[in-house]
Amino acid sequence: MPLHRTRIKLCGLTQPADVDHAVAIGADAIGLVFYPPSPRYVAIERAAELAHRAGPFVTVTGLFVNASADDVARVLDQVPLTLLQFHGDEPAELCAEIAGKVGLPWLRALRVQPGADLVEFADRFATAQGLLLDAFVEGYGGGGHVFDWTLIPPQWLPQSPSLPTTSAAPRLVLSGGLSAQNVAGAIERVRPYAVDVSSGIEAARGVKDHARMTAFVRAVREADAALGASVQA
């Protein structure tokens, strides 16, 4: 039995069949994008349908970029979200204010680039339930790129393959260019609380591929099992 279970968020779902498949293969969370320029954007009416299909034990995450409190409340009038993800330039005070008004936990995304002070960022957003680390690109979103994992503070990483992450680490959600081919290495190196994937499970931008979704979830579970076996060996 692995000592660590990596949670899995499949983001940017737009079709009912995608949500049904995510639930069937054991995803812990799905992500719905409420940022109109994104190819994965979903209108409120469609999002409400998708969220209801997720059922009671899958976290439904709403991704917002520089949205106002009124924007978020308008979505929540129809969409039963259970987690907010702020993916723009929102300051900590605004994130906490919006989440407090609607009574939901929240994540804050950081687009990682050389020179970024992740420890200072984590301190500023200490009231978030987790930090999502994504690749930096112009605009918003990671664009399917992997960022340099050596930029993650060493005190946040496991001290050896057989040990969990240290208590100094925030709840990290690792994103940015993940796929079934590289997620095992990410888990072994970073040991994140969760992994988040979007483009890595697509056949084309905004079009999810069920075989890739299945392969990604399988790769995460196998990586967790391998880490558990190495601890017990």
Swiss-Prot record:
Keywords: Amino-acid biosynthesis, Aromatic amino acid biosynthesis, Isomerase, Tryptophan biosynthesis. Pathway: Amino-acid biosynthesis; L-tryptophan biosynthesis; L-tryptophan from chorismate: step 3/5. It comes from the Bacteria. Its EC number is 5.3.1.24. SUPFAM superfamilies: Ribulose-phoshate binding barrel. NCBIfam families: PRK01222.1-4 (NF002298), PRK01222.1-6 (NF002299). This is N-(5'-phosphoribosyl)anthranilate isomerase. It comes from Ralstonia pickettii (strain 12J). The gene is trpF.
